[in-house]
Amino acid sequence: MPTAATETMVHLSDVVVMEVSNPVFKQKHATRNTLARNRMLARLTEATEQGALLATHDNAELMWLRRHVGTDDIAEPEPYLFCFQHDWDALTSAERALRTIKGLVEFHPDWAFWGYDAALLWGLEVPNDLLGPRFLVKTGCSVPLSAGCRLLRPRTASALEQVDGVWVTPFWRTVEDCLLRAPFSYGLAIADSALRAKGVSHDDFCERLCIDCEGRRGYRRARVIASYADGLSENGGESRFRAFFIAYGFPVPELQVEFRDPLDPNQVFRVDYFWRLEDGPCVIGELDGKGKYTLQDGGDRESVDPFVAERQRESHLTMLGHKVLRFTFDELKNPGKLAEKMRLAGIPQRADLAEEWRRQWYGR
């Protein structure tokens, strides 16, 4: 019969054995953690390269990712969708929306998108303020209404097309859906980019809109947007400033007018806006200092400091005898001050033009 002392020794012996095996267990556990971490970081990298958020159907992976959100540079910007935090921080609002959509499609391959989401996938200019709740087509799939999704019942399911692996409404249906609901300046950005992307004429665009949308809610305003659309506008910012000129009674400028550099005949400057004024010098308008140039001989421009290049470019344009008026995007937040700036530059503001636009837009 063992004594109490013997029982204690056996117990202590067991503890010693456990202490010996513990480092081995810890090493194996650390190895498994390292392998899991490397695997998940590799998957995040792959998703980033594909322009999507990582969506996982594996519960163990989901638990690992959520444990490491806020560490290891991992973020969960949308439920069940993950990415690197530094990468997400560097994205524009449009890029974030696109990656979110592509991540959602990993979970729901039967989902289809319309409106502003579809416009993004088609490569159209969609202002950030229009990005928010997802625009989903009702195709019999399960849709989380609690997420604030906006549903559309398409006329025919066969009308859907795929863009980058995502089901969307056709190009022109997408444009029309956007114009039927968008504010004027935002809708003009979308309409301009549609004309630019497809190279169709302004008249053909207006005719298509009339055939497809007459009688639909929002058609009158969509028609107003289409009437001012111009495919020469190169980005959404240029379109929104042009919308301001229209709504506030300023003459609509010519777009993307080219001028030869008076000091270098091989270089041609292309300006955003150009007003030919009856009284006084003409005015060149430039947005955000993003000057554009082309070399006639097809050569490469030597790399120079962008600020210095812009100042030189502006001085050369002034040599042509034109005023140069620069706009910054924040100026749209203070339309009264922006209008005063344009008047001081010699661009006439006409009350009758502003009133004409108001009658068109508001119907009175």
How should each PLM-predicted stretch be described?
Residues 11-46, 51-52, 56-60, 195-364:
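Surface segments flanking catalytic/ligand-binding clefts of nucleic-acid enzymes
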Residues 1-218, 349-364:
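Short gly/ser-rich loop at a beta-strand->alpha-helix junction or flexible surface loop bordering the NTP-binding
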